[in-house]
Amino acid sequence: MGLIKAAAGAFGGTMADQWKEFFYCDAIDKDVLVVKGEKRVGGRSSNKKGSDNIISSGSGIAVADGQCMIIVEQGKVVEVCAEPGQFTYDASTEPSIFAGSLGEGIHRTFDTVKKRFTFGGDTGKDQRVYYFNTKELVDNKFGTANPIPFRVVDRNIGLDIDVSVRCNGVYSYKIVDPLLFYTNVCGNVEQQYDREEIEVQLKTEFVRDRKST
């Protein structure tokens, strides 16, 4: 008899979450790296009690050019799609990956981080849809805060002097492995992860690499 309450609760949750939703992401702004997918529920939909972070089996998920979509379940990546189009979420199937232009490297990362979960009674799941901006992010300015001491030596003319050098310019970058970015950098963001959150770190490493060369 100890299963009655859990069974009743599970049944009620299933009834509330059984209707299809549609997850999508509008064009991602150039200053945004990751954004949580929006759930579209029509005004005539009866699915008003569905859990916020539950994806109903049969839900549609749209992916646009320049985006990579991942589904995260209990903090672990279980689905990846970098191919533009519309897809149907089927909870009964094994994890899938549509690598698109990301290539074989994303397959290896996916094999490393994926993990399936099973629960009894309540759903016990937190499922989220995230979209990554995979376009090239341009016009990132950098510059040395202070002059860099540099020694100039030319033994042919007997030159050996110390000079100070400054440098500045722009660079671009893109997210080539969204799974690594999720697991090592952004994690479960509430709504979105902006490029300004890693801007200082990127500039510091970029200038440091220039100094070493």
State what each model feature region is:
Residues 1-212:
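N-terminal hydrophobic membrane-entry segments
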